[in-house]
């Protein structure tokens, strides 16, 4: 779900249809980074969508991708601060943008010589902006450790898989990120790194 064009009326219709939570494909919390990702929404749209969900007590998650083109320590800080302001039920944060062949991003990176060759893109290949390449994963881990509602897929994935299997075994249903804040799992998972 995109935060752009989200409305209270849309949320009401989703609730009436049985929706139990929303995962926004937010990607970033900086207008500069959102433009680089060619997103059709702004930071103000993210704030508004979050406020609508909070006003109704509706569980929501913002999924983020740190390290995209043009990412800087300033935009990383803006994204973290926006998540603190928006107070989502959970934040799913990843480092690095998966680059697929034959996409505008792949073509731009190939033209600049930042990808070893198109063949490299047929396997999982992730781009991290040079300005944040050193230290980005640790900065995101620090943000997660300081908050109880952040999940970091790919950083200790086996522990998360075992935890989520146990939660499912206890009968928990739906988006498991909904339980992260309530059970303080995000901080525990980040600390296990």
Residue ranges and their predicted role:
Residues 32, 36-37, 66-74, 89-120, ...:
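Flexible glycine/acidic-rich beta-alpha junction loops that bind and position SAM and/or redox cofactors
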Residues 49-60, 86, 136-151:
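A structural motif corresponding to the C-terminal end of an alpha-helix
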Residues 103-193:
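Radical SAM enzyme core and accessory elements
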Residues 19, 88-89:
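Proline-aspartate-enriched helix->loop->beta-strand connector
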Residues 1-61, 66-68:
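Conserved SAM/AdoMet-binding glycine-rich loop
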Residues 9-13, 69-85:
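Catalytic cores of alpha/beta
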Residues 6, 45, 71-75, 132-136:
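Soluble or luminal CAZymes and related metallo-dependent hydrolases
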Residues 49-52, 81-82, 96:
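Generic recognition of well-ordered alpha-helical segments
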């Amino acid at each position: 779900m995109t935060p752009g064009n989200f409305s209270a009326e849309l949320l009401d219709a989703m609730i009436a249809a049985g929706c139990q939570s929303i995962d926004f494909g937010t990607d970033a919390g900086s207008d500069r980074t959102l433009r680089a990702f060619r997103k059709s929404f702004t930071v103000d749209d993210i704030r508004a969508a979050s406020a609508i969900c909070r006003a109704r007590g509706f569980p929501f998650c913002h999924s983020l991708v740190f390290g995209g083109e043009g990412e800087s320590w300033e935009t990383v800080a803006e994204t973290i601060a926006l998540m603190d302001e928006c107070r989502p039920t959970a934040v799913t944060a990843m480092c690095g943008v998966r680059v697929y062949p034959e996409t505008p991003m792949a073509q731009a990176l190939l033209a600049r010589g930042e990808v070893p060759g198109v063949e490299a893109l047929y396997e999982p290949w992730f781009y991290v902006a040079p300005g944040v390449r050193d230290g980005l994963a640790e900065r995101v881990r620090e943000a997660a450790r300081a908050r109880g509602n952040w999940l970091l897929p790919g950083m200790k994935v086996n522990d998360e898989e075992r935890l989520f299997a146990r939660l499912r075994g206890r009968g928990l249903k739906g988006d498991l990120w909904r339980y992260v804040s309530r059970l303080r799992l995000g901080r525990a998972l980040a600390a296990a790194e």
